[in-house]
């Protein structure tokens, strides 16, 4: 079961990373998107999820 759980974590990490990259790209192309409150909330949430996931993986591997 551990292997399946790891696979799901990797898939979710990749999806979050791809979505965050696309949203950051669109933000550079059209900076007026930052005026949209929900766009900013979603972008911050995706980046936060990536940071927490990375920290969780580092914590699991060190201990």
Swiss-Prot record:
What keywords are annotated for this sequence in UniProt? Host membrane, Membrane, Transmembrane, Transmembrane helix
Ranges facing Extracellular side: 1-8, 53-63
**Residue ranges, Cytoplasmic compartment?**
30-31
Question: Where in or outside the cell?
Answer: Host membrane
Q: Name one GO cellular component term.
A: host cell membrane
- Transmembrane parts of this sequence: 9-29, 32-52
- Taxonomic classification: Viruses, Adnaviria, Zilligvirae, Taleaviricota, Tokiviricetes
Q: What is this protein called?
A: Putative transmembrane protein ORF63
Native organism is Acidianus filamentous virus 1 (isolate United States/Yellowstone)
Membrane-topology annotation of the record? Multi-pass membrane protein
């Amino acid at each position: 079961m551990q292997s399946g759980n790891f696979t799901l974590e990797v898939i979710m990490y990749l999806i979050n990373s791809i979505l965050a990259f696309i949203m950051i790209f669109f933000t550079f192309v059209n900076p007026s998107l930052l005026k949209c409150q929900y766009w900013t909330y979603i972008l911050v949430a995706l980046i936060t999820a990536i940071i927490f996931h990375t920290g969780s993986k580092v914590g699991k591997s060190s201990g």
